């Protein structure tokens, strides 16, 4: 199965199986890569835009009342433009430019930035009508569902002052 690629490895099946699926209003693509030096999601957004959008469509097919929102920090204008073009003809998806600041990509902050709904530490995103997945997870969903390719790899950034040849691998 697919696990979340944001770091915790949470099973995507569980995330996509809320107790009240009809109350899910937002599927938020966490495209806010706010940590210094990290650019893996940025490159994936640029190079695999169609796969990213396709992964969102797969999730939206499970939640007929939901809208898909690609939440991208405003310092990634090229990604914003490319995603806007990719979703221009789809009335259920849009792109939201977020202020570039840390920790914009943290789930609770991201939900608030997109929906203005605050969730406390006892709540899950579904309690606020949201499901949040990151770039790599959405591309993994596309690869698994559309291409039949299992999720067995991910792109990571290796960078910093001590790295001789930084890059995304």
Provide a role label for each language-model segment:
Residues 3, 25, 66:
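Short acidic/polar active-site loop segments enriched in Thr and Asp
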Residues 40-47, 74:
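Alpha-helix capping and helix-loop boundary segments enriched in small/acidic/polar residues
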Residues 13, 37-39, 106, 166-167:
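Short helix/loop capping segments that flank catalytic or ligand/cofactor-binding pockets
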Residues 4, 27-41, 162:
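Gly-rich Lys/Arg/Thr-decorated short loops/hinges at beta-loop-alpha junctions or inter-strand turns
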Residues 2-17:
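Conserved phosphate/anionic-ligand binding catalytic regions in large, soluble enzymes, centered on
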Residues 66-169:
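Hydrophobic alpha-helical positions that pack around
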Residues 14-34:
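Short, compositionally biased "basic patch" segments
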Residues 46-62:
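Histidine-anchored nucleotide/phosphate-binding helix
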